[in-house]
Design a protein with these regions (language model features):
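Short acidic, Gly/Pro-enriched loop/turn segments at secondary-structure junctions
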Residues: 168-178
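Short acidic, low-complexity segments enriched in Ser/Thr/Gly/Pro
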Residues: 97-126
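OB-fold ssDNA-binding interfaces and closely related basic DNA-contact patches used
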Residues: 1-107
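Exposed beta-sheet edge/beta-hairpin loop segments within beta-rich domains
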Residues: 122-138, 145-155
């Protein structure tokens, strides 16, 4: 008796490389942005040197475009070209030239109405919220899909799961505990 398990390959799903950096991490509680439905979200900063992940994302966007042609067409007579609709893969050098975290990188904003699974490098669930912050590195399981909402058309990125691989310098101006302690220690000696 054979145990034939066929893995279904979803061309619109991508698992990023381990050098993807997480920013604007909002993965513990859903938040509403501009009055919309509350969502979990993260900005994934992908080095341009990670050509494997970048190519997978481009292929998934293309697959989502073809899968969603009817949705993108809507009531119109034609499907708009992929080059003229909203694209989730964005160039950090062009869109965030003053932010060193985005230099030589692409970025994708991923979100979901359901909480992502979050695990460590050994695939154990992360339960301590402070372990996941803007600046950590890890893999992200994401999927791409077409949308057409009130004439606003494009490809969006859904957030499935996250795997933290390693810590990184916190982004967003939050000081590390080490630097805060050192500063306090120095200030105490200055006033003594």
């Amino acid at each position: 008796m054979s145990n034939n398990t066929t893995k279904v390959n979803n061309p619109m799903k991508v698992i990023t490389g381990k050098d993807t950096r997480w920013s604007y991490t909002n993965v513990w509680e859903a938040k509403s942005i501009t009055g919309g439905a509350p969502k979990f979200s993260v900005s994934l900063i992908i080095p341009k040197s990670d050509t494997v992940t970048v190519q997978k994302i481009k292929a998934a966007i293309e697959a989502a475009y073809h899968e969603g042609e009817a949705k993108l067409k809507g009531n119109g007579k034609f499907v708009p070209a992929l080059s003229v609709i909203k694209n989730p893969l964005r160039d950090g050098d062009t869109e965030r030239p003053d932010d060193p975290a985005y230099a030589e990188c692409y970025f994708v904003n991923a979100n979901s109405t359901t909480a992502p699974g979050i695990v460590d490098a050994d695939r154990n669930p992360i339960l301590v919220r402070s372990e996941v912050y803007s600046g950590v590195y890890g893999r992200a399981s994401i999927n791409f899909y077409a949308f057409n909402s009130n004439g606003n058309r494009g490809i969006a990125c859904g957030l499935n799961n996250l795997q933290k691989i390693r810590d990184g310098e916190p982004l967003g101006g939050k000081a590390s505990a080490e630097s805060a302690v050192s500063y306090t220690h120095l200030r105490a000696h200055e006033t003594a």
